[in-house]
Curated annotation (Swiss-Prot):
Domain of life: Viruses
UniProt similarity note: Belongs to the orthopoxvirus A47 protein family.
Name of the protein in its database record: Protein A47
InterPro entries, alphabetized: Orthopox_A47
Amino acid sequence: MGNKNIKPSKENRLSILSKDKMDSFKRGSWATSSFREKSRATIQRFSSLRREHIKVDHPDKFLELKRGIYKIIQKSSSIDVDKRTKLMSNIKTMMINPFMIEGLMTSLENLDPDNKMSYSSVMILGEFDIINISDNEAAFEFINSLLKSLLLLNTRQLKLLEYSISNDLLYAHINALEYIIKNTFNVPERQLILRGQYLTPIFSDLLKYAGLTIKSNILMWNKQFIKPVSDLYTSMRLLHCVTESYKVIGMG
């Protein structure tokens, strides 16, 4: 009769232990693999939902701003070079005498289409063939939008912009302001480092008079500045639209 109490040999015990470890490893590997797959699927789903949430709740404010400005600029397409030159010449005069802009806006708002004598009070269009331009609704709306954008700025900003136009600095300031907008408009707060072309004295003053604070070379951003920066950017873009033709014939 066989002895049931015979213990397995050392080799058999090692074989059994090895088999048990292998089975445990396989079970553990399967569990780990399954967990990883489920985790990966969960993360992908969360990321997808997060992207959708951001896309819906946080539209690109800069893109929206540019679209609005582009619609205004399109209305200037019928204004020829000579008229743009006269327009810019008169606007530059008013930018260093800002009280004239407010008076002009009042005159424009009170224009009587049936009374041609009333046009004489509109100084900016005195040499601009106002009678013909009044028949061009799109051009008239562009001029109106340009003047309104300038009215939203303060006296110091207007004088700095006039200086920028006269010294061919306007486009550089537009590029610098776009850099700031792209890096700030979609966040509530930020400290943005400014260097080189983004930290020139004139441009720094434009930001300062829009209410922003620059400490050393760091811009202290808060979402409350979106409105004044948008106003500044709009006026700069509309002015540049006029100066493009203004420079072509050597009047800049």
